[in-house]
């Protein structure tokens, strides 16, 4: 005995100096509930490395009672220590009954420790079959121990660290030490020719062990395996056999334990496995399945084991009748497993729909119909904006139309499945259609966020860049390919994770960018000055095409709406990212499974998507409803296919054909600039606008006024009127009155011309004076009292040959700044305006009453008129009253700034 004790002590010290590094956990494959562990082939150059976790593992093993009753009673220790030492010196590990008990059949070997395919722990081969780890709590069924076969190590014995049953006898201390040494020796692995110092740890093996312990399952905490999903109803008549128990590895991860994979019969009971059921551990190739022999009359679901009811199934599991759960029947079922349905969710429901809806009650209805109504509202707003865009044509209409189309698609694809078959609980939709409806709205919302960033970032009209279009097409293509691949080929299911992860990243990034742009409004460059500002003079400037949010009020509305979309976009991206991590096995905590956490998570996803889509729909509706200007209709542009649809632009006579009556003032000479059409040139070309009237940029339109070509006396100051009137009414008014200063402000666009052109006379009066001075029938004498050139010529009668010589006279205005036409005393007073518009409405009111608005009355005739002053005063009063009445009629009958409706 003393020699044997010394030999045992020496062997124990040798093991302490050189102990192998702990192996990685061996994972299971689908359809393999019970497996055996196989050691790797031995090599001649074997070296044991120091195990860093020796003390920790030895502490977890506990006292000698962990060996349990089956080990101490079934297999006596047959080999002697001398024989074992000889085997160790020779390098040939033969099998013995104890070795068969620990690792299985003689042909199987333990994998190399520290490699990619490793066993679980050095002590894993000697663990009892009972399991104390659970995920959902104990069941109410009686306890019984499942007895493994001789020479076979099951997952319950190899991957579970438990305490011995109370009925197990405590073995002798010497047997404990001997078996402890044998377990260490059995776990010894070669280094395949690589020699290292026995006292130094193997860094490669230690890192491999740490990586095996921490990933992919159990990194953040207690994780229910993503390889199962219980969110759909079970097939009728399909039950899980009680002889297959769900085993749980008690290997401590970073913060807790990790649930291993259930057998396929359990997946058949809960018929929605998760997305990554094709993901398996590296050691899945060397796994052999063996069913458990048990007494059929005794139930195997104890408080320390997991039953299907512990995963949320409310239905009672029928027990096996005597002889009904025999081994051949189980093998037949395993040989032809039914095709498991496609996983629809990344987060498991952990219950069937009947129990879940019973727990939710009205919360389920509020979730489904409330979210569906909100998505329907998004679709209606997008449709309304699309209908209004052709009639208003705001700047940036193509980008706004694309934004509305994306929101319409996202709203309809979310609202329809919620109303028709919410989350697929009724199985009304095909799997491929359901997956497409779930995945396609995400790239649409991400592209909508990108378009919103473009609309807010540019002061000018945005154009959809090729990068955003390519990103949209990439997202849509990836989502469609992931849904199609998941429905057709199960190994392609990780594509859904890639698609969802990409959209989560894009949603978070673009939402943060949108928040930054909306908060950057204070430093944003001013898009343009309002019309009629301090720097504006003269004709109406040609409006530049700008961003739909260039006006201040539109920008304020957008700045109040965009941060809401950005905030909810960040929330949606975070939830989608967590969903992807949970599908990979990270992020789950104990107590977060069940119907209510699933309901809250799905509600958060829907609210995040609605919070992004609804503000974006309002953002696209603002320019169509609240555009600061009313431009030309887009439908008119579309249907105006030929130039004949518009009024012809005629130079010279301005009227096609020979006029019936020679217009008033036809003898007025016109320069070359006056032969231009009555339409302002919006494109590049000669500057025909008045002083300060051109839009030379967003700022400083009037800061640097320059003399334009239209500022000369020979130019026509009516070239900015557009479009030309079919009856040339505007030209007739101008020629009859010789000045736009008589018109009310705002009548034909822009401010009052009297304010716009201070100190500038009527340019055509100079040409009139030139005509009078250079006409062949004119007398050469000068009228006394006329100012000297270059001042305006003195007023006088029209030339005898003109058609207006008997109807009007020419006179100076009150401030002597322009020459006006006055009625002739030879005939009764008449006004061409009143004759054209409506009969005169004489009034007995005093002619000295101030004119309404800012109308300017005609000046009295000059002092050189042959008529007496007493006769002319009455005529002047009546003429002024008629003129003011005509101006009022023009204001009442004018429509906008384009034409005059008679």
UniProtKB/Swiss-Prot annotation:
Residues 1-18 form the signal peptide. The modification Phosphoserine is found at residue 642. Residues 72-92, 121-149, 281-333, 701-723, 774-811, 839-872 are annotated as: Disordered. The chain crosses the membrane at residues 371-391, 393-413, 432-452, 468-488, 501-521. Its main location: membrane. It is a multi-pass membrane protein. The keyword Translocase does not apply. GO terms for cellular component: membrane. Keywords: Membrane, Phosphoprotein, Signal, Transmembrane, Transmembrane helix. Residues 786-798 have a biased composition (Pro residues). It is found in: Membrane. It comes from the Eukaryota. Residues 799-811, 843-854 have a biased composition (Low complexity). InterPro entries: PRRT_domain-containing. This is Proline-rich transmembrane protein 4. Residues 122-136, 281-302, 704-717 have a biased composition (Polar residues). It comes from Mus musculus (Mouse).
């Amino acid at each position: 005995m003393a020699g044997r004790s010394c030999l045992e002590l020496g062997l124990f010290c040798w093991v302490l100096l050189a102990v192998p590094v702990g192996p990685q956990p061996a994972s299971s494959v689908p359809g393999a509930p019970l497996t055996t562990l196989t050691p790797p082939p031995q090599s001649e150059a074997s070296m044991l490395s120091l195990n860093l976790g020796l003390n920790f593992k030895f502490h977890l093993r506990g006292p000698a009672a962990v060996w349990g009753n089956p080990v101490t009673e079934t297999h006596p220790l047959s080999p002697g220590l001398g024989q074992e030492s000889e085997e160790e010196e020779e390098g040939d590990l033969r099998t013995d009954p104890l070795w068969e008990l620990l690792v299985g059949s003689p042909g199987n070997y333990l994998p190399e420790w520290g490699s990619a395919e490793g066993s679980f722990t050095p002590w894993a081969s000697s663990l009892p079959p009972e399991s104390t780890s659970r995920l959902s709590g104990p069941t109410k069924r009686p306890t019984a121990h499942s007895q493994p076969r001789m020479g076979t190590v099951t997952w319950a014995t190899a991957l579970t660290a438990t305490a011995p049953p109370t009925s197990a006898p405590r073995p002798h201390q010497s047997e404990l030490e001997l078996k402890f040494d044998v377990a260490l020796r059995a776990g010894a692995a070669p280094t395949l020719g690589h020699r290292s110092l026995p006292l130094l740890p193997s860094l490669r093996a230690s890192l491999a062990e740490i990586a095996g312990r921490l990933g992919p399952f159990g990194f953040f905490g207690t994780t229910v395996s993503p390889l199962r999903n219980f969110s759909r109803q079970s097939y009728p008549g399909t039950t899980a056999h009680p002889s297959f128990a769900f085993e749980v590895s008690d290997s401590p991860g970073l913060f807790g334990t990790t649930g291993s994979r259930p057998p396929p019969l359990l997946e058949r009971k809960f018929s929605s496995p998760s997305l990554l059921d094709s993901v398996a551990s590296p050691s899945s190739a060397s796994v052999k399945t063996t069913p458990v022999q048990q007494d059929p009359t005794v139930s195997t679901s104890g408080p320390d084991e997991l039953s299907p009811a512990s995963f949320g199934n409310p239905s009672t599991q029928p027990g096996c009748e005597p002889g009904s759960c025999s081994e051949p029947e189980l093998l037949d079922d395993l040989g032809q497993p039914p095709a498991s349905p496609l996983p629809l969710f990344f987060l498991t429901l952990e219950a069937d729909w009947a129990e879940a809806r019973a727990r939710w009650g009205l919360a389920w209805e509020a979730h489904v119909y409330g979210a569906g109504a909100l998505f329907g509202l998004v679709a209606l707003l997008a449709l309304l904006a699309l209908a209004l865009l052709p009639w208003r044509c705001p700047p940036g209409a193509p980008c706004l139309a694309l934004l509305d189309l994306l929101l319409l698609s996202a709203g309809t694809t979310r609202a329809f499945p919620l109303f028709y078959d919410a989350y697929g609980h009724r199985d009304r939709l095909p799997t491929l259609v359901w997956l497409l409806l779930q995945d396609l709205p995400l790239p649409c919302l991400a592209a909508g966020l990108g378009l919103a960033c473009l609309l807010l970032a540019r002061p000018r009209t945005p154009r959809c860049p090729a990068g955003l279009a390519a990103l949209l097409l990439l997202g849509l293509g990836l989502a469609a390919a992931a849904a199609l691949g998941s429905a057709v080929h199960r190994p392609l299911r990780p594509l859904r994770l890639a698609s969802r992860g990409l959209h989560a990243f894009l949603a978070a990034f673009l939402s943060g960018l949108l928040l930054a742009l909306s908060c950057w409004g204070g430093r944003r460059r001013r898009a343009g000055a309002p019309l009629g500002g301090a720097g504006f003079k003269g004709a109406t400037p040609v409006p530049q095409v700008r961003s739909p949010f260039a006006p201040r009020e539109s920008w304020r509305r957008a700045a109040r709406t965009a941060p809401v979309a950005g905030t909810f976009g960040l929330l949606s991206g975070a939830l989608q990212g967590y969903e992807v991590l949970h599908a990979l096995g990270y992020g789950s905590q104990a107590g977060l499974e069940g119907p209510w956490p699933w309901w809250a998570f799905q509600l958060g996803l829907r609210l995040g998507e609605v919070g992004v889509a609804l503000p974006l729909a309002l953002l696209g509706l603002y320019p169509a409803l609240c555009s600061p200007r009313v431009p030309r209709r887009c439908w008119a542009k579309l249907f105006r296919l030929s130039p004949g649809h518009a009024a012809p632009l005629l130079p010279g006579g301005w009227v096609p054909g020979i006029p019936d009556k020679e217009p008033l003032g036809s003898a007025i000479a016109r320069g070359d600039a006056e032969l231009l059409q009555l339409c302002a040139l919006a494109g590049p070309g000669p500057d025909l606008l008045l002083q300060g009237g051109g839009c030379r940029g967003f700022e400083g339109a009037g800061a640097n006024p320059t003399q334009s070509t239209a500022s000369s006396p020979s130019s026509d100051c009516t070239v900015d009127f557009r479009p030309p009137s079919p009856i040339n009414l505007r030209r007739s008014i101008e020629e009859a009155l010789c000045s736009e200063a008589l018109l009310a402000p705002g009548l034909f666009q822009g401010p009052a011309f009297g304010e716009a052109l201070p100190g500038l006379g009527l340019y055509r009066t100079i040409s009139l004076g030139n005509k009078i001075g250079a006409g062949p029938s004119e007398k050469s004498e000068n009228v006394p009292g006329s100012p000297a050139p270059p001042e305006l010529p003195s007023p006088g009668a029209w030339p005898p040959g003109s058609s207006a010589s008997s109807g009007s006279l020419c006179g100076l205005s009150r401030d002597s700044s322009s020459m006006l036409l006055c009625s002739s005393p030879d005939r009764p007073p008449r006004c061409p305006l009143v004759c054209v518009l409506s009969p005169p409405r004489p009034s007995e009111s005093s002619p000295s009453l101030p004119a309404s608005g800012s109308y300017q009355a005609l000046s009295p005739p000059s002092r050189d008129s042959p008529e007496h002053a007493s006769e002319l005063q009455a005529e002047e009063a009546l003429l002024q009253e008629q003129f003011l009445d005509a101006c009022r009629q023009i204001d009442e009958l004018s429509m906008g700034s384009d034409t005059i409706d008679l």
